[in-house]
């Protein structure tokens, strides 16, 4: 087994877990019980320059089953294959499902690294608890995922921008109709080799900011990575594309508070009303997904100590006014898939608001963040955020 990766302290669950009366005797998720079955029919490889995100999958997958009476069964790594689910499986009817998005990188030194995997494990744990899926040991799950990555490490393409995208997923599998806690679940992980998101350089996106559509609201599940948050975004996304925009800028409330962009967190670098240079992003108030890239940008920028870094609310009125007054330096989205994504224009209430792009296709800060994160992910800079696993 690979060396254990330690996790930082995490929040205790705030919701009850489905359990039999003999809770203490239920089996916990245990990576030492992991068994590995090697495929005898390797999957077809795709030339890395022809990879389409999320369309190609590696040879193996991880599966961890849970049952209310027994707890967690021994985890397995086996050949990638279809799942067998009953038509009555609760996940198919009530969206009792959550997932993660994380990556493994082949570094400039040919060693394999993850990027802040403890944050992904913590978020998956919190998403699971919020959806009344069973508790699990984050350290043990990370050990299992690490073994899966090592098993399929030959699927990780070399080169900056390339990676193996990891998709841990937790679903309720109980076979009955009725809204309630699932008496069984499946936690699995599949891997997809990914090409460079920007194969020919940055491509700024245009956004549709339409207050008619709301992504999340107080007391909801906007801070979880549940599939229930993504399906309702597809129609507004199609409306944005019909108006020539690539993404939706999600707004909330009567004052059109800015929240997220597409499936990414949002940042704005500007001169605020007090005349200060400030990097600002919406706060984690329960409506915002706590992105790993988001947290990394906040941590890095605060470490530079070159300008003010704030996690606070702001609205489209402030953005529009600042753009018209020339106080916005740049805006960008941040997420696992793209790392950072420059914003070039916002369509809002009949106006086309142009966002500065100092370097032609991105802002200077956007480019700096992208470079610094890549240097960590690919090992050019040794950092605790990028543990070497192989």
Swiss-Prot record:
GO terms for cellular component: mitochondrion. It catalyses: L-leucine + 2-oxoglutarate = 4-methyl-2-oxopentanoate + L-glutamate; L-isoleucine + 2-oxoglutarate = (S)-3-methyl-2-oxopentanoate + L-glutamate; L-valine + 2-oxoglutarate = 3-methyl-2-oxobutanoate + L-glutamate. CDD domains: BCAT_beta_family. Its EC number is 2.6.1.42. InterPro entries: Aminotrans_IV, Aminotrans_IV_CS, Aminotransferase-like, B_amino_transII, BCAT-like_C, BCAT-like_N, BCAT_family. The modification N6-(pyridoxal phosphate)lysine is found at residue 225. GO terms for molecular function: branched-chain-amino-acid transaminase activity; L-isoleucine-2-oxoglutarate transaminase activity; L-leucine-2-oxoglutarate transaminase activity; L-valine-2-oxoglutarate transaminase activity. Its cofactor is pyridoxal 5'-phosphate. It comes from the Eukaryota. Keywords: Amino-acid biosynthesis, Aminotransferase, Branched-chain amino acid biosynthesis, Pyridoxal phosphate, Transferase. GO terms for biological process: L-leucine biosynthetic process; L-valine biosynthetic process. Pfam families: Aminotran_4 (PF01063). Belongs to the class-IV pyridoxal-phosphate-dependent aminotransferase family. Homodimer. Catalyzes the first reaction in the catabolism of the essential branched chain amino acids leucine, isoleucine, and valine. This is Branched-chain-amino-acid aminotransferase. It comes from Monosiga brevicollis (Choanoflagellate).
